[in-house]
Amino acid sequence: MHLYFSCFILLFVPGGKSLGINSHLKHMSNKSQDQVNRTRTVGSKDVAALPLSSYMFNLYQSFHHSELNHGMEAAPSLSLNHRADIIRSLAVKSYDHGGSLWTFLFDFSSLSQEEEHQFAEVRFDFRAFSDAILVGMEVIVDFFHQSSTCQSISGFCQSYLYVGSLTSTLWPRSSDTWVTFEATDIIHKWFERNDKGKNHSEGHMKQPKKLHRAKSAERRYQQRSTENPQILMMVYSNISKKEKLSGTATLLQDAAHSKYLAVMPGIQTIANSRRHRRSHIFNEHIMGMKHVPSADSSRTLCRRVDFFVDFKQIGWDSWIIHPVKYNAYRCEGECPSPVNERLKPNNHAYMQ
């Protein structure tokens, strides 16, 4: 039995995606699309299925080509990407623009305060707004937050959390049609509100002028979604120094300290973890797990043991040139699943 572990991070949450850097990027596009197709059938009915971001897949391919060519030409801001452990994209939930006044509505709840955030930028395809904006025009952008849990079949929630504003000049990149502008200050303001405990204060809950009516906002969003502008906020971050010093967690290390050593259907869902970087799907799958105070020393937890394969012994030696005998290893013992999320499985080594 072989266990394969992956060191990259790719989380699909409502309104957001993220990725980490490693060398296994070549065939990720098709696999990710299959995963999304599967998760759409089990997800909440209130959350609309989001199309996969072509920019994120181009980013995957850029890393793959840069590893093959050992160059720095493939990806936009590639030097910055290589300095980031995690690249997360947040898809806009709704937007509106009228001349120089713009309004973007994001869900920032997937951002983790435990990470070291280096940089953030907003990007969109200039061609989707070519009839409404001019090259070089200056715009004022208001950023609002709305959690995905506020979504319902009837429409958007009535209240939005104002995060901050910025002024930017719209210049398409010379190499493509993407318009980008820095939004690092918006991310910092979001975490400042969390630190001060004001993210639920009524003083910061208000109706943006461009989204003052839920029905109207929903209608405008549906009309523009057909153009698929792919307005994204890219957030570049590193894992914390403490987590780096602790080393990369593995599935076996996590299982050895897991508190979920027995399965009992019907138990309530365990409370959501504070670590938002983990997929929300994980929280849905830990229903029915019996909480045990600690691992019993009499239990034999999963470990790797020898498993020798001798082709001569099974009569295949005339077919096999090399190796005639090798150690394939196997897993023996009890392997509790899921692992305790309070540990640090930063390689996301969950059994598939």
From Swiss-Prot:
Its main location: secreted. GO terms for molecular function: cytokine activity; growth factor activity. Induction: By dorsal mesoderm-inducing signals including activin and vegt. Not induced by wnt8 alone, but wnt8 potentiates the response to activin and vegt. Keywords: Cleavage on pair of basic residues, Developmental protein, Disulfide bond, Glycoprotein, Growth factor, Secreted, Signal. InterPro entries: Cystine-knot_cytokine, TGF-b_C, TGF-beta-rel, TGFb_CS. Belongs to the TGF-beta family. Cooperation and regulatory loops of multiple nodals are essential for mesendoderm patterning in early embryos. Plays a role in mesoderm formation and may be required for neural development. This is Nodal homolog 4-B. It comes from Xenopus laevis. The lineage of its organism: Eukaryota, Metazoa, Chordata, Craniata, Vertebrata.
